[in-house]
Every structure is written in structure tokens, then in C-alpha cells.
Amino acid sequence: LLKWMRDYNSNKNKDEQVYFYGMDIQYVKNINQKIRDFVLKKKIPINEELLNTLDKCVNKKIDYGKKSNWEEIQTPKLNEIENVLIEYQKNSKNENNTEFNSAIRALNYLKKYTYYVQNNYSQDRDLKMFENVQRIIENKSKNGKAFIWAHNEHINNKGFGNYNNRNIYNLGRHLKENYQNDYYSVGFDFGTGTLGGYIFTENKSNEWKTYKLDKPFSKTYAETLNQAKDDVYFIDMSIALKSKVASFLKKKTNQIILGGPGYNPNRNNL
């Protein structure tokens, strides 16, 4: 992706180039300092007690599965900071709106993370990612287009796998319902290659390891698709589902699913 972006942008005007914008709200490191630096630079009157809220929210760790009222306590304070920034921007003449908008955008990411601390399910994270994508498209895209890069489980149209019998809305499902035919998702599968995985070992430092897959797992889509003569290819599902391979594609079959920690040979990734 990085190489493609570099090649694509090399002969484009600045307004035609592709830019990176983060959409995830799972990590917010240094957002507090970014906002603090901005407030100090512009000499915006926000008291230190209120600014300390930024530090607390950035440093707050997520206790997955545990009940909390963190968002209910902290969000009103973050809203107060946002209101001061917006009001100061309205009253400022000849100021760089880009700097203000960047600070407010950072604050909104922190607000979404604060929400996620209290509501830490997959559908909550994906809802906030969807809201960020909307904001980016509406405010940053010159032509309404955006290229969204994420795991298959986030960008597919149908929602997450039915874990624990919960009907979970994911990012792709929100995007499909909102943008309808203007949203087109592309999923990736593979059969062989080198996979990275973050290994968690008790009483030891976590480490990143790589593992080699010499052949596809049996009884997977990849086992069949890997037999094609082309190394990389795309299948248009709208066409394929009307062809003679429809029965194969409609059949429930396993597929490798890798999340943030990557591949773990000791765990079933299918």
C-alpha cells in the first residue's frame, strides 16, 4: 500500500494526492500533548485542572469486560474543552483554521476512546471508526472518495462473525448501509506465505515472531483458490455468484482470520 501510494502521488498535484488519515480509536498516545501544545501556543484560557483530564483519558487503560462509568465522568469535561476551543476559534481573526480543526479532531478521537473505555465491545469500536470515516470523507476528501484499509472482519458488508450469538455491526456494515452502492469492499485471502504474530508469554516480555505457511490449511477457500495460475487476482462476487462457481462460493468453508496480534500457531485461526 505504501509503495502504491508513493507511486500514485509521484506525478500528482497536491490536491490530487492520496493522504493518510487514522480512523481507529483504540490507541490515543500523545493526543493530550498535541492539544496541550496547541493551547499553549495560542494562549487559550483553559485551566490546568481541565487540561489534566486530557492526560487522565489518554493514560486510562481499557479493562475489557469490566463495567465502568469512566465515559460518563470524563466526557463532560472533554466537551467543556471542546467548547472553549470552538468559541475561541469563532472569536479569532486571521487564525489558521487548519490548526484549530486538527486540535478539535484530535480531541474528538480522545472522546471516542473515552467512550470505548466504558463500552469496550467490537461493535462500539467499529461504530466510532465509522463516525471517523464519515468525518474524514466530509471534511478532507475533495471528490468524496476514500480508500479504507482494515482487517477483513472490519470492512466486510455483513458484520462480524456471530461470536457468542451476538449480531454485531462492524465498520463495513455501517458503511454499506450509509453509502449503499458507493461502498465496495474487497476482502483478502491467502494460502501460503510468512505470517507475523505477537506472542504473549506469562512472566516474559511479549515478542513478535514470524511463521511460514508452506501450504494452505485443508478444507479452506484458500486450498482451492491457491491452485489458480495467477499469484494475485480478484474475484468480482456479483459476477461469480451468477456463474458455475456459485455453488463453491456459497458453501460454508473455513478461512483464516487474523486480528491485531496476528498469527498464533497454537491457536485455531480458522
Predicted features along the sequence, with ranges:
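Well-ordered, non-membrane alpha-helical segments in soluble/globular domains
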Residues: 1-2, 127-130, 165-171
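Beta-strand elements within well-structured catalytic alpha/beta cores of enzymes
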Residues: 5, 21, 145-151, 185
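Alpha/beta-hydrolase fold catalytic core
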Residues: 95-144, 153
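Generic, well-ordered alpha-helical scaffold segments in large soluble proteins
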Residues: 8, 132-139, 174, 178
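Long, well-ordered, tryptophan-enriched scaffold segments
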Residues: 4-22, 26-118
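C-terminal regions of proteins
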Residues: 123, 155-270
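An acidic- and aromatic-residue-enriched active-site/binding cleft used to recognize and process polar
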Residues: 23-28, 152-153, 188-191
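Loop/turn elements at helix/coil->beta-strand transitions in domains of secreted/extracellular proteins
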Residues: 13-18, 142-146, 180-183
